[in-house]
Regions:
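Long terminal segments
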Residues: 118-130
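Thr-biased low-complexity repeat/linker tracts and other Thr-enriched repetitive architectures
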Residues: 41-121
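Extended, small-residue-rich solenoid/repeat segments and analogous flexible loops
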Residues: 1-52
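Intrinsic disorder/low-complexity segments enriched in polar/small residues
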Residues: 14, 30, 35, 51, ...
């Protein structure tokens, strides 16, 4: 995805506020990403979001607001993680799933399909939510 395509997804932006990650995705200047190689494909990390450890965001996934993705977590497909949500340990969020507000997904949990995890919900261990 080039910058023009990025603008089509998120609206008019100042180009200098963005840079393309080494892995191919896009990172906003306010977001904190430990390893740019882990932001791949058309993924977007913006706002005050943080991605660190060996966490990966790829496909068409978005991580934004104050959300955090870390450890060995994966967010991919068309998944959205936002608000104050956290995805960590070996958790995976994918498909069209959304994790937001103060929700937590961790351990070996998987959230996928059209699942919504929000408010103060916790999904953990070997749980699956579709």
């Amino acid at each position: 995805m080039n910058y023009t395509e990025l603008e089509q997804k998120i609206g008019k932006q100042t180009e200098s506020d963005w840079h393309q990650a080494s892995g191919g995705g896009w990172i906003h200047k306010d977001a904190k990403v430990k390893n740019e190689l882990n932001i791949r494909d058309n993924a977007i990390v913006m706002g005050n979001a943080q991605v660190y450890g060996d966490a990966r965001v790829y496909g068409d996934a978005w991580v934004y607001d104050d959300a955090r993705v870390y450890d060995d977590a994966r967010v991919y497909g068309n998944a959205l993680v936002y608000g104050d949500a956290c995805v960590y340990d070996n958790a995976q969020v994918y498909g069209n799933a959304q994790v937001y507000d103060d929700a937590r997904v961790y351990g070996n949990a998987q959230v996928y399909g059209d699942a919504l995890v929000y408010s103060h919900a916790w999904v953990y261990g070997k749980s699956e939510r579709d």
